[in-house]
Regions:
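Transmembrane-helix bundle segments that line or gate the permeation/cavity pathway
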Residues: 80-116, 123, 132-158, 186
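N-terminal alpha-helical transmembrane segments of multi-pass membrane transport
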Residues: 1-98
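Loop-to-transmembrane boundary segments
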Residues: 170-186
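Conserved small/polar residues in nucleotide/adenosyl-binding loops
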Residues: 188-192
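Membrane-water interface regions at transmembrane-helix termini and the short interhelical loops
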Residues: 28-29, 52-65, 120-130, 147, ...
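Hydrophobic alpha-helical transmembrane segments of multi-pass membrane proteins
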Residues: 73, 128-131, 135, 179
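Juxtamembrane inter-helical linkers in multi-pass membrane proteins
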Residues: 153-174
Length: 192
């Protein structure tokens, strides 16, 4: 198993999440909310991880199905673990497991929530919650593949691990271009 490449890809994915965590900071600044500070800690940790292990690509850079499965599983867990931190740090969801549930619900677009009054959240947290649903709607890993532009062979193994069903072999060769088109359409039609 190519653990160096797994670490490299995961750190690049976490680097993407660190950038996404900075968007609610801008929203907080626009609405003059102090709770936006809660996004800086996880974003800083993720940026540090990215610069420690996600910048230099390992010499042995091939991955196969087994590595793809490990990367997909760990990516879902790590994105949710770090994505839950702002809810807990801000104090609006003090129980970390509840915040984790809320974030997993967003990234998987299940629609479940532990919040009784979602609108009571500050705008930056409400934006982050909505962003997790938006990203999850198209698939976290497809989104990251579009942004990180891994080589086609490695992307194929990650896509096969992410996409369910027997038709995934037909999807994979054109998945990157299809995903870019879909995200372009989604951005164009979003009322964000």
């Amino acid at each position: 198993m190519n653990t160096k490449m797994i670490r490299y890809i995961l750190c690049r994915m976490l680097g993407v999440e660190s950038v996404l965590l900075m968007i609610p900071v801008i929203v907080a600044a626009l609405y003059q909310e102090m709770s936006g500070i809660a996004f800086l800690i996880p974003a800083g940790i993720l940026l540090l991880l990215f610069f420690l292990a996600g910048v230099k690509k390992p010499e042995q850079s091939h991955i196969y199905g087994k590595e793809g499965m490990v990367i997909v599983a760990l990516a879902w867990i790590l994105w949710s673990l770090f994505g839950a931190m702002p809810f807990t740090i801000s104090g609006f969801i003090p129980n970390y497991m509840d915040a984790f549930f809320e974030t997993v619900s967003g990234f998987t677009t299940t629609g479940s929530s532990i919040l009784r009054d979602v609108e009571a959240l500050p705008q930056c947290l409400l934006f982050w919650r909505s962003l997790t649903h938006w990203i999850g709607g198209m698939g976290v890993l497809v989104f990251v593949l579009v942004l990180t532009s891994l080589d086609k062979k490695n992307s194929m193994y990650l896509m096969r691990a992410e996409v369910p069903g027997p038709e995934k072999d037909k999807l994979v060769p054109k998945a990157m271009s299809t995903a870019r088109i879909l995200y372009g359409c989604l951005l164009y039609t979003s009322d964000a």
